Amino acid sequence: MGISMWQLLIVLLIIVLLFGTKKLKNIGGDLGGAVKGFKKAMSDGESEEDKEPKKLSQNESRTIEGSVERNDAKTESKHS
């Protein structure tokens, strides 16, 4: 129960009659320009440094400083 070709043509004809071909051409051009601008902004935001993960050299190591506390105290239970 989809839309047939005739229904699509009728809807397209009504849109052309309402807006006119010149206005539809302008809307299409504006929409295309917006998509191009969005794609360009997305590609400009990604630099080569962001694309590749930072690799540590073989001689480079990381030291994490801190202290560890261990609490082994057992609670005393009262027996009645």
From Swiss-Prot:
Chain residue ranges for the region called Disordered: 39-80
Q: Which domain of life is it from?
A: Bacteria
One GO biological process from the UniProt record? Answer: protein transport by the Tat complex
Coiled-coil positions are none
Which GO molecular-function terms appear in the entry?
protein transmembrane transporter activity
The family line of this record is: Belongs to the TatA/E family.
Q: What is this protein called?
A: Sec-independent protein translocase protein TatA
Q: What organism does the UniProt record list as the source?
A: Hahella chejuensis (strain KCTC 2396)
Query: Which gene is the coding source of this polypeptide chain?
Result: tatA
